[in-house]
């Protein structure tokens, strides 16, 4: 009985402490390298041919009249004709703040902050190489809109080099999607062979202004190769060492809470995933594709995809089989994935994420009910053994070895497993942690309302009502469980403080997580009533 209480106390406090630490770490600003260390790492032999971006606003961007605007049902994008870079991207269906109409801005380039997506052609005859500068494209219009009944929207940019070669860069937008096809069509009308190589990179200010730091969790790079399915590569990593990994396919991305931007070259192409840090304090991560030799009179098409949007696992998986891993559930991903699937399944029927969380809770408690019943039965048997255990303690005194042997014989004789009540507790801990990560990482819960005062299940309860109710429910559960007379007084006091400690812990947890714990406690109270009634009929109290 006492050992079960000890495990419950230690387990709950340990898990809560871990989650509290993680929550605080997520909310705290990420440490960044000093500017001197960043500048020291600028030199890079493997990315020197990839053009750098200005730290401020380029003249072409400042004179916003020159920007090409693209509007679809999901994206509001601005493209700089110099280089054909995406310098602004707003997500139409996702709002900056709940209740406001302003769309969420993911990519932007301002005086103090840069987060853009570049792509171009480098190599010996590259029109975007550092030596030659960036290509200045022309286009037939400066505004493009996806019309009703139109599934795709093409935005063609054209550049004619001095040698007469025509380069066409085409952005293809799709209805209902956040991925953009970026295609190059090269028509070599010159008398000499051409050698080019496509690249795509994402540039972001390492020290973004406060207004740009919209989300509290991980912000930094990530990549995937043949050898590494998924790995985060934060700004400190980039400052210390440049990536230079050859792979077939792969992708490179910048992550932040709920949102991601990623370059995804064709899975069958040989690519190099690279990173660097520029002297202006910009972190760069991207890919360099295969080198293409284009004979005189020949044509060549080179393609890639760019994703800029929410961490939608279905959409990301459709682009690359590993891109959905940017939804990072931690070491319990194998448990979090089915929980997320079940959460989505329930929500598709009830249309309310809070109700879906309640259904998840009922499902978990229902599955664990046989174990919960075994737990309380074991605890009741242990309580009935307390007089006999007290006799053993009096008989053997300080002889721990004989005392232990006698206790084991007594347990065997009475068919009692002293650890039998711990299994439900042990099983609930990973479920709790996995659900924590699901609620923290799943973009679907961003701005998802429940009812009454809970307007966003992904953030803390603004009035702390749920944590207080959760504390009350824990207090009721505690009062329902008899305390063994042999229990140490210090342990009794610690158990009495548990509801208070947990209430304080949960004040800043996502309200969806607190809702799960509160409903779980209510169900547990009902289960206790039912189980105890059955045990009393059997003479077990």
UniProtKB/Swiss-Prot annotation:
It comes from Shewanella sp. (strain W3-18-1). Belongs to the OXA1/ALB3/YidC family. Type 1 subfamily. Keywords: Cell inner membrane, Cell membrane, Chaperone, Membrane, Protein transport, Transmembrane, Transmembrane helix, Transport. One of its GO terms (molecular function) is membrane insertase activity. The keyword Membrane applies. Required for the insertion and/or proper folding and/or complex formation of integral membrane proteins into the membrane. Involved in integration of membrane proteins that insert both dependently and independently of the Sec translocase complex, as well as at least some lipoproteins. Aids folding of multispanning membrane proteins. One of its GO terms (cellular component) is plasma membrane. Pfam families: 60KD_IMP, YidC_periplas. It is found in: Cell inner membrane. It is a multi-pass membrane protein. One of its GO terms (biological process) is protein insertion into membrane. InterPro entries: Membr_insert_YidC (IPR019998), Membr_insert_YidC_N (IPR028053), YidC/ALB3/OXA1/COX18 (IPR001708), YidC/Oxa/ALB_C (IPR028055), YidC_ALB_C (IPR047196), YidC_periplasmic_sf (IPR038221). This is Membrane protein insertase YidC. The chain crosses the membrane at residues 6-26, 325-345, 349-369, 420-440, 457-477, 500-520.
């Amino acid at each position: 009985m006492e050992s079960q209480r000890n495990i419950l106390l230690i387990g709950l406090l340990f898990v809560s402490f871990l989650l509290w630490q993680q929550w605080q770490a997520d909310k705290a600003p990420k440490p960044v390298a000093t500017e001197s260390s960043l500048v020291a790492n600028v030199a890079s032999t493997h990315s020197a041919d990839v053009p750098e971006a200005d730290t401020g606003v380029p003249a072409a961007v400042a004179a916003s009249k020159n920007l090409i605007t693209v509007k679809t049902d999901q994206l509001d994008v601005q493209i700089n004709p110099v280089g054909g870079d995406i310098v602004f991207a707003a997500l139409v269906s996702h709002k900056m703040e709940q209740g406001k109409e302003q769309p969420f801005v993911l990519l932007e380039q301002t005086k103090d902050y840069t987060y853009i997506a570049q792509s171009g052609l480098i190599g010996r005859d590259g029109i975007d190489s550092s030596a030659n500068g960036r290509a200045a494209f022309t286009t037939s219009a400066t505004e493009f809109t996806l019309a009703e009944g139109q599934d795709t929207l093409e935005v063609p940019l054209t550049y004619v080099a001095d040698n007469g070669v025509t380069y066409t860069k085409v952005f293809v937008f799709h209805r209902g999607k956040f991925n953009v096809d970026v295609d190059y069509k090269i028509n070599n009308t010159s008398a000499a062979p051409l050698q080019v190589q496509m690249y795509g990179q994402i540039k972001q200010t390492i020290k973004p202004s406060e207004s740009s730091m919209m989300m509290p969790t991980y912000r930094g790079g990530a990549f995937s190769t043949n050898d590494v399915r998924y790995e985060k590569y934060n700004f400190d990593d980039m400052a210390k060492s440049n990536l230079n990994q050859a792979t077939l396919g792969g992708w490179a991305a910048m992550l932040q809470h709920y949102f991601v931007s990623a370059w995804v070259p064709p899975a069958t192409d040989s690519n190099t995933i690279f990173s660097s840090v520029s002297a202006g304090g910009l972190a760069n991560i991207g890919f360099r594709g295969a080198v293409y030799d284009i004979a005189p009179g020949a044509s060549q098409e080179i393609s890639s995809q760019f994703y800029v949007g929410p961490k939608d696992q279905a959409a990301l998986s459709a682009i690359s089989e590993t891109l959905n891993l940017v939804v990072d559930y931690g070491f319990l991903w194998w448990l979090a994935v089915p929980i997320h699937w079940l959460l989505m399944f329930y929500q598709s029927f009830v249309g309310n994420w809070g109700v879906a969380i309640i259904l998840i809770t009922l499902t978990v408690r229902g599955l664990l009910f046989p174990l919960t019943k075994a737990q309380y039965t074991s605890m009741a048997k242990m309580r009935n053994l307390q007089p006999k255990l007290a006799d053993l303690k009096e008989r053997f005194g300080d002889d721990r070895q004989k005392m232990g042997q006698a206790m084991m014989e007594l347990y065997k004789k009475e068919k009692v497993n002293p650890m039998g009540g711990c299994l439900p507790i042990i099983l609930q801990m990973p479920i709790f942690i996995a659900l924590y990560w699901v609620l923290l990482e799943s973009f679907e819960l961003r701005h998802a309302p429940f009812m009454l005062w809970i307007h966003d299940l992904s953030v803390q309860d603004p009035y702390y009502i749920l944590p207080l109710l959760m504390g009350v429910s824990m207090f009721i559960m505690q009062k329902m469980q008899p305390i063994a007379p042999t229990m140490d007084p210090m342990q009794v006091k610690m158990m009495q403080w548990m509801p208070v400690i947990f209430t304080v812990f949960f004040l800043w947890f996502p309200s969806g997580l607190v809702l799960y714990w509160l409903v779980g406690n209510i169900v547990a109270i009902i289960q206790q009533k039912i189980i105890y009634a059955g045990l009393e009929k059997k003479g077990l109290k």
